Every structure is written in C-alpha cells, then in structure tokens.
Amino acid sequence: MELRVERTTLRFRTPLRTSYGEVAARDLFSVELHGGGVVGRGEAAPLEPYDGVPAAAVAEALALYAELLRGFSADVPGHLLLDACRTAVELPEALAAVDLALWDRAGKRAGRPVAALLRDDHLDAVPVNATIGALNRAGAAAAATLAAAAGYACVKLKVGTGDDAGRVAAVRAALGPTVALRLDANGAWDVETAVRMIEALAPAGLELVEEPVHGVAAVREVRARVATRVSIDETADEPGALTAAVADAVCLKIGRCGGIGGLLSQAALVRATGADVYLASTMDGPLGIAAAVHAAAALRVDLACGLATLGHLEGVVVPEALRVVDGTIRVPEGPGLGV
C-alpha cells in the first residue's frame, strides 16, 4: 500500500475570531491511499489553537504511517491497517486521514456511498447550522438575516467575546422567532459567569449553549443551575467525559475522534448516557466535511451539525455534492466519500 501526503496552507476569508483567539490560516493534509487499483482519499485537519495539535506532529505521524503501510499488501483488511498505524503513533488527527481514505476506498470498491456501508436506513440529508463569529451587533445581525433567508433552521453565535447581550438580541431580532439560536462560548466563562450569562440570555430563546465552561466538573455545575440545555465540545476530550452524563448533548468531530470509526464508537458511548450527539468541523476541507456528513447520516442526528464551513476557506471550491440547500447537506451519492 502507498500513502501519498500533500500539505497545503489555506487562509480564512476573514480571520476566525473566537474566545480562544484569532486564526488567519490553517494547514490541511490531503492523503491518497493507493493499492489494488483503487485510490482512497482522506484528510487531516489539525487546528492547533483549538485542539492543541501542531501541524508538525501530524506531518511526522503521516510520514511514519506512509513508511509503515508500504509493508502491507492491498488485500489486508482496513481495520488491521488502521490498527498498525495506531500502534505506531496514536494521534487521532493523523489517524483520521488514514481512516477516511480506507472508508473512501471501501465505498469505491463496493460501488456504494460510505453512509450506505454504515447503515441501510441512513438519513438522505443532514441538518446543518450557520455559524456567526465574533462580529459586532450590526455584523452579526446582517449575517443572521442572510442565514435565515438561505433557509437555515439553526444559527450558532459565538459568545464570550464581549457585548454578548447586545449581539444575541440583535441576532434574535434578525432571525425571527422560529429559527433555533445556539450559543458557543468555547469555554470563555467561569461557572458563575456562565450561570449569570445563560440566565440573562435565555429570554432570547436558546436551543442550547455549547461549551460554556471547560471541564467536566464545571460543566456539571452549570448544567445543574440553569434551565437551558448545555452541550460540550472541547470538554469531550477530557478522560471520562463521554460517559459522565455531564451534558444534554455532545459535539463530536471527525479529526478529534480519529476518523469515522472512532466517531461512531464515541457516539455510542454518549448515547448510552441519554445525551444527544451532533457533529461539527474544525474548518475541515471537503473530504472531512463529506466524511462527517456520511457519519451524521448513519447516526441519524436530530440536532443541526456545524458542517456548513467550507465557504470560510479561501481557494476552496465547495463541491456540488456538499452545497447547503435549505439548511441541509444531502449525503453525497457517489461511491466512497463521493467528492
């Protein structure tokens, strides 16, 4: 087997501003897995300010995987190839690239979309949310107006960056009463601030508040003190978080989970606690978004997923198969990942 790796740097159309800082560009690793006349494609999308994973670490891991995979023939089962890579270097963001390539290859060999390999009765389309960053009131309201006009049924607003009450009010006024409003603090608040802010903002009609604070113990306390639903994102990385029944919902990401297989396993753990699952990207490229759509379809998610993010990247043409229509992305119909 031959693993080919290409690294590119992509700039954001406008810098990504959240409570953890401003990011102007991201590294993306595209991989091709060659063997048996079929090429599987995948990607690794580390975002160090968010996940703490340096691009250099991913590059090193992928180089080791490439060297390792040369020793395997094309008829070796995919799970054994992935296990071998994991044994060499267990770095989820790098493993995700191999996992995606293996699923893409399997789908192409079977002539079926990945979602169909995972589940016969998968969703045909996955609900997605629009995301509004740390814009001022006028900018946030304008973005909300565009999102509502485009048919999004859910909008996520980044908070914890100042003037939250004014921005939330402006966005709700622009959206009207029927579009769900989700807030994401990226852990910017402490417990007391989170409780105070959530209670103050709740009259705007909140679907849920994502990652109001960091850490299982802190999230548990906030959830116990507010009526609004609370979800975790970054805290999902904390040991034991997925089984702690600490939140009403958990946001899972392809890269952080090590690919589709890892994400499905983690989703099962979360659902066993009674919590909901939804997916989001870390500003992934087209292959990462496609993989997440297939996984979300197989999971039959109800909550809108944060996968409408390709438009934030300069130089990336959104594939027709991944275009957002009326707040949903249809499952790509082509074999494999379908893009």
Model segments located where?
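Flexible C-terminal active-site loop/helix
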Residues: M1-F12, V23, L28, M283-V339
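N-terminal amphipathic alpha-helix/helix-capping segment at the start of soluble metabolic enzymes
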Residues: M1-L10, R17-A24, V31, L82, ...
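General beta-strand structural signal in soluble alpha/beta enzymes
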Residues: V5, G42, A116, A130, ...
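Metal- or metallocofactor-binding catalytic centers and their adjacent structured scaffolds
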Residues: V5, L33-H34, V39-A110, L313
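Conserved, mostly hydrophobic/aromatic
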Residues: V31, G37, V98, G111, ...
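N-terminal small/glycine-rich loop or linker at the start of catalytic domains
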Residues: R109-A134, R167-T178
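Catalytic domains of carbohydrate-active enzymes, especially glycoside hydrolases
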Residues: L146-K158
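Catalytic core of soluble alpha/beta enzymes
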Residues: L157, G162-A290, V317, V324
